[in-house]
Amino acid sequence: MAWLRFPRFRRAVNVFNPKLFENLSLAAFLAWVGLGSDALSSSAYGPPEIYYALKGHEYLAVFLAIGIPISVFVISAGYRQVIALFPDGGGGYHTASTLLGPKAGLVSGAALIVDYVLTAAISVASGTEALLSTMPASWYGERILVDVAILLFLIFINLRGMKESIKILLPIFMAFILTHTILLGWGLLSHVGAVPDIAYNTVASVRQDSMQYGWIFIVALILRAFSLGGGTYTGLEAVANGVHIMREPRVQTGQRTMTLLATSLSLVAGSLIFLYLMYHVHGQQGQTLNAVLYGAITRGWTVGGIPFGPTATLLTLITEGLLLFIAANTGIITAPIVMANMAVDRWLPERFSYLSDRFVSRNGVLLIGFAAVVILLMTGGHVSILVVLYSINVFITFTLTMAGLSRHWLAQRDKDPLWRGRLAVSALGFVVTASILAITIFEKFDAGGWFTLLVTAIVVGLGYLIYRHYKSISKITAELDETMLDVVPEHLESGPNLPLDPRGATAVFFVSRFDGLGLHTLLTAHRMVGGFVKNYVFLLAGIVGQGEFKGIKALEDLKVYVETEANQYMAFCRNEGMAATWFATYSTDRILAMEELANVAIRYFPQSIFFAGRVIDTSAQGPFHGLLHDEVSFIVQDRLQHDGFSMMIVPVHVRGIPSKPPNIVLPISMSPDLELVQNEEVKKEEARVRAAAKAQATTQANIQESTPHAGTE
């Protein structure tokens, strides 16, 4: 018989290839490009929001131009600690879960998921507006179509794989760095003589306003501007989340990436805010504040007597817009990493922890990408609306992260001689981030902040319900394991190696581990077909999810685990006098792995009958059951049957079983032979009942005769 081959729409990859992690991992420079673009692109809307908040008191921009870089380095210093403590990635979610508890981790993760959706949406919307501002005004009305098209393109390239998408976007990132370095550097150097005047005017204005309004007013205005420009900081989290995709040594690579990011963000954001003040720019109809600034800086530029200023401004705006698309890509890249970590902890459906055969969390990419499309359609792609929703959630994560670090260093004060300095960094970070969070919620609550908090609360609630469901299922399967494993000898010793018969009938079992479900399936099949089956074959698929895709060591541990479970099935079968063997494979795709295993089983045992077990919990069935549990057994069953092979899914009811058989309400006809058999059986049953009644009556009569009556001697 020919070896069965399923239709192949995906390309299998050897997960044990030692070059795989090297090829997919990112050096510090590529990580800066792929994960740092979110922060740098925020210069398109973060600094302008800060400057707009100072309306009438623009002189305070000097303090913000200094304060923004300081706060960036404070937060990034805290995240350098996160990278050192958690080199396998996880960022703020893992930090909060480990240092503050699972529920804090759920809140942090939910906030990050919503924030990354908004990152993708606002970045695409801002980038589209930046590009369309260089086009005829009639094009502006079509921006929502452009937004959706760009998001769909980003989803596509991310489904192709992490490193490939970064290589596509690398030229854009470098063009942004080049144009902005030239433009901002020239702007500062050409007006350096104005610095003394700016300093003098700032001191004079501070004195005047402090006398007129008081120092509290000035401090409050600075803090309000900080909070409204909170989008400037949002990209700092991405590096800590993505440490596990960086090249070894991961900690050093991650910290170098964080240093590159913090330095570049501080220079760009601080320079922009100072240049707004230096060039006295103000917003103009149809132009962003950055566009006005770039035009002012390049005014009078010529090359060979030909005006070059407008062209330089155009090129700079184009690179700015394209970098915003890279930032959207960062949200789509990083959110699935957070979701995969949450799925491993069972706050999200377990399928989000699976990687596709291109080593991308396919489900997460699709969900985040299309959620961003929905947000864009709901808001019409208006940046003014999106920016209100944007910066709250990341500061929830920042605050929880810094609180967790502070708690950790306090607990380590007797073990770590450097705990005081590290605590000072994390505590300062907590004060900064908590202050910005509180002010942002206060300022933006009525303007749409309530919606962001509501959506985050809904995600938290759903995560808790999902966790409760999985916990209930785990309890049920544990009870099943306890019941079924009682049939296994305490010290399972393998019997003699019985010869396999490749030409004989073979029962093939899809199992995941040596557990109650697998044993129930095996014993049920043995009871049904054991009379003619010659071989028992077990197929195990080691699924490489986010938890295992962290290096060869984790994969080797997975291999040892799978083979140990398989050998237990073999030992049990041989102990019972059954010829058995097993096959195992390792893949990022469960269905693909089961297909490969079925192909191999049929190659060696052409007369195969397939079995798989399924836990039936009728009390837990609901409309979302299919989302929480992958029904891959049914998919494989359908494909096997299509190719002419039988597969039985053996159910095991664990609760919610009806107490009596269901009523039969339809009239049922039967063949005369069966009716005759039934009549004979009825007659036999009636005779048995009569004989039993007669025997019981005789026994009672004998008892009465042998019992003395009252009053007799």
What are these regions (language model features)?
Residues 351-363, 398-445, 476-486, 623-624, ...:
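C-terminal membrane-solvent junction of multi-pass transporters and transport-like membrane proteins
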